[in-house]
A protein has these predicted regions:
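Gly/Pro-enriched, hydrophobic low-complexity segments
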Residues: 2-13, 32-133
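Short, solvent-exposed mixed-charge patches
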Residues: 141-142
Length: 142
């Protein structure tokens, strides 16, 4: 993708592949003034670690919108930590969308690389011509 995000960062995980537990049960936390649950996400198999590239993750979930708004991920190789932080959320057509996300790959306290993902002009439920989805167009682009 040419960024600090990988495929597993932008897709929904198969929840059956992970064990979950609260980071500090009973302790309330906030991200940008909103209540979050802080949850450990531990892969159940080496295959999942290989597929995602992460040994474990600490995710911050807003219960009011059921959305991960921050994550710390332990990268499988190299001793890196990846920090994912949703800086801006918008409700578009009734769907919560992370329109500004910062990703930083760190080794110790040093930032090795960072990516800022910004989404603009997001629209849902648009009518599209089926010809946009031919194999040729999907492979070559418009």
């Amino acid at each position: 993708m040419g960024s600090d995000l990988n495929y597993s960062d932008i897709t929904s995980p198969d929840l059956e592949d992970y064990d979950f537990s609260f980071y500090e049960k009973g302790k309330e936390s906030e991200v940008r003034g909103k209540k979050v649950y802080v949850i450990w996400s531990i892969p159940r198999s080496k295959e999942v670690i290989e597929e995602t590239g992460y040994k474990k993750s600490l995710v911050f979930v807003r219960p009011d919108i059921n959305m991960v708004v921050r994550a710390i991920r332990w990268v499988k190789d190299g001793g890196y930590l990846k920090y994912v932080d949703t800086k801006k959320l918008e409700q578009i057509d009734g769907i919560w969308v992370a329109t500004e996300t910062y990703v930083a790959k760190k080794k110790g306290k040093a930032t090795v690389h960072r990516t800022i993902l910004t989404l603009t002009n997001v629209r849902f439920n648009q009518s599209l011509d089926e010809d946009l989805f031919t194999i040729r167009r999907m492979e070559k682009g418009l």
